Amino acid sequence: MEIQFHGKTALVTGAGSGIGEAIALDLAAAGATVVVADLKQEAAQKVADRIAAQGGKAAAVSGNVADPEVVKAQVAAAMANGGLHLLVNNAGIGGPSAPTGDYPLDGWNQVIGVNLNAVFYGLRFGIPAMLQSGGGAIVNMASILGSVGFANAPAYVAAKHAVVGLTKTAAQEYATQGIRINAVGPAFIDTPLLSDFDEAARNWLIAKHPAGRLGRAAEVSALVLFLLSGQAGFITGSYHLVDGGYTAL
């Protein structure tokens, strides 16, 4: 059965590149009006323009989602474009690399701000808007590191574990009110976020995946669209991995 979102409006954060861009493009191709949100207006507008060029409907918004007022404005933009029926809290950053005992405090606050607080803000402002719109579905972008540890990334790992817990809690709260909420946990995906990795580092990452390669943004997007669709109507409060066997080791 083909997934369709005609008559639905989606808000996707971190949609200027990588996984978020793939999700925004796929949602638009499936008929949704997409509010493309990114830190940089230029990046968001570029994706919105691509959607328009392909015959879809999109609006571009920007700002730092670590600021609750920015997220509130992004939700308002969705409401101005037909409501809020689909929400993907995807924005994220990697942060500094350092062991917990040496981790910079400002780095901790920055990572928690974008990777955890922004997800809460998306739920805090998005859920009332979604209820007003008649219900819908939400996907929070976690990570494989929402279930395992990873040395020298304490803030990232802590945030992603918390996203999984927040997802399960909110899903319980709104399961009877027409809102489903799930989390997706990608492994290492071949996106611009890995552009600074040299060949040795990429090979080290690849070796951690039994599939023998990095993931593709389209593979994550395919799962996200399924979870947002009516085909996943009995799935809520779940954490779904896209990891090439990473956590099976």
Named regions from a protein language model:
Residues 143:
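Residue(s) in the substrate-gating loop at a strand-loop-helix junction
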Residues 98-100, 104-112, 194, 205:
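Substrate-binding pocket helix/loop in short-chain dehydrogenase/reductase
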Residues 3-35:
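Canonical Rossmann dinucleotide-binding motif of NAD(H)/NADP(H)-dependent dehydrogenases/reductases
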Residues 123, 159, 167:
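Active-site helix of classical SDR
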Residues 120-123, 131, 213-242, 246-248:
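C-terminal substrate-recognition "lid" of short-chain dehydrogenase/reductases
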Residues 128, 172-176, 233:
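Alpha-helical segment proximal to the catalytic Tyr-Lys
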Residues 41-42, 62-73, 105, 218-219:
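The beta1-alpha1 cofactor-binding region of Rossmann-like NAD(H)/NADP(H)-dependent oxidoreductases
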